[in-house]
Regions:
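N-terminal alpha-helical targeting/anchoring segments
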Residues: 1-98
Length: 101
């Protein structure tokens, strides 16, 4: 499947959650491979507590085959760990030019 694998993961999670999601690399690896604060940003629109919304997103994320683990942190951050298979696929899509690797 062509395109940015991280963007595809964000779109897949966003489609499952019914909202646009941006994934970022956390500065601390203990916070997962990717993280999002979408629950904190959109809680007022959904009229729900951020932590409750993040817990629902974590359930949806955990159902995706690319996600090995999803957990809520702090007031409503969502931390994601991707599967080794997804990571291998993502690394395989990196274009390295004419190098023979």
């Amino acid at each position: 499947m062509p395109g940015n694998p991280v963007q595809r993961l964000a779109e897949e999670l966003g489609a499952a959650a019914g909202m646009q999601i941006e994934l970022e690399r956390p500065s601390d690896p203990a916070h997962g491979d990717y993280a999002t604060n979408v629950a904190l940003r959109t809680a007022p629109q959904h009229r729900r507590p951020p932590k409750e919304l993040a817990a629902e997103l974590a359930e949806r994320a955990a159902a995706l085959e690319e996600v090995e683990r999803a957990e809520v942190a702090g007031p409503g951050f969502l931390n994601l760990w991707v599967t080794p298979a997804w990571l291998a696929e993502a690394l395989g899509e990196i274009e390295i030019g004419r190098a023979h690797v």
